[in-house]
Every structure is written in structure tokens, then in C-alpha cells.
Amino acid sequence: MSSYMEAAAAARAAEAKTEGLLRGACALLAAAAALLVGLNTQTETVLFIRKKATVKDVQALWVLAMAAAAAAGYHLLQLLRCFYLSRFADGKPCRHRRAIAWLCFLLDKGCAYITFATTVAAAQACVVALYGTHALQWTKLCNIYTRFCEQVAGSLVCAMLAAVGTALLSVVSARNLFRLYPSMLSPPPSSFVG
């Protein structure tokens, strides 16, 4: 019986370590996306006028920067929670385990949806900047602000990877949540056990 408990404890520790690594990667990717797009500026001369491209020129990019920064902060807090639970609260029962698991599950889902939605909205705005919209007489901007567009593309890649990682973390949260509920299935009859 003790070998089973030791194996279960080792499995929980490995799962916590994997979740921590994934949360750390998501935090780094989201922070990189926020910094790449948030600190990005480029000044060019267009028809004898100096124009400066910033993240605030495109509302979707500004929202992406704020959402990615919030996601990075959230993942950092969850990483600290994972660290605390794996180091200091190992084996101690918690009265509010289900409530905490539900909260983590819902926050992970919300973070995944928001990160994905803002990344896709920013990508759509970037497609307009890349190709222009002739019906609205919007010209291409990426041939003028090349470095700005390249950095935005890099931030979109980081943000999309963070969104995929956050979706994986929501699966982990769902597993951790529903593990707390007992199975409703009855055990198989003894004739099937063999």
C-alpha cells in the first residue's frame, strides 16, 4: 500500500512540475508578445512629413498588448501557486480544494479565450495593414513601416503560442478539477475482473 501512495505522490509531483513548466513558458511567451508589440515604434518620412507608427495607432494591437500583459501576470501568479503547492502544502488537506479548482479552471478558460480572441483580432488588423483595403482607400502600411510590421508579426507568433499553451493549461485545470469528483460508475462485476 505504501508503494502505491509513493507512486501516486511522485505522479502528482511530476504533474505539478509539468504544469509549472507550461505556465512558465506561457508567461514568457505572453510577456514577450506584450513587450514586442507594446514597445514597438518606427518613424519614417512620408511625403516630406515625419510619421511615427506606434501601437496606439491600431486599437487591436493596443488591446493585444494589454491582454498579453495581463495573461503573463496571471500565469506568473499561477506559477507561484504551483510552486507553493508543490513545496509547502504537499499532502496537507485543503478545505476549499473544489472551490479553488473551479476558480483556476474558469480563470484558465477565460485567459485562453481572451488571449486567442485578441491575437486573432490583432492579426486581422495586421492583414489590413499588410495588404490594404482598396474599397476603403486604405493603403498598404507594411511597405512603409517594415520593421514595425516585422515586430508585430513576431509578437503575434508569441501571442498565438501563448494562447495554445493556455488552452493546454485549461485542459490540465479541467483534469485537476474533475479528478476531485468521484466516479458515478459502479465497479464492474467480479466475473469481469478476472
From Swiss-Prot:
Cytoplasmic-side segments: 1-18, 81-109, 173-194
Transmembrane segments: 19-39, 60-80, 110-130, 152-172
UniProt signal peptide: none
Keyword field contains Transmembrane helix: yes
Keywords for this protein: Cell membrane, Membrane, Transmembrane, Transmembrane helix
A cellular component term, taken from the record's GO annotations: plasma membrane
Extracellular side: 40-59, 131-151
Domain of life the protein comes from: Eukaryota
Localization: Cell membrane
Assembly: Homodimer and heterodimers.
NCBIfam families referenced in this protein's UniProt entry, alphabetically: A_tha_TIGR01569
Protein name, entry field: CASP-like protein 2C1
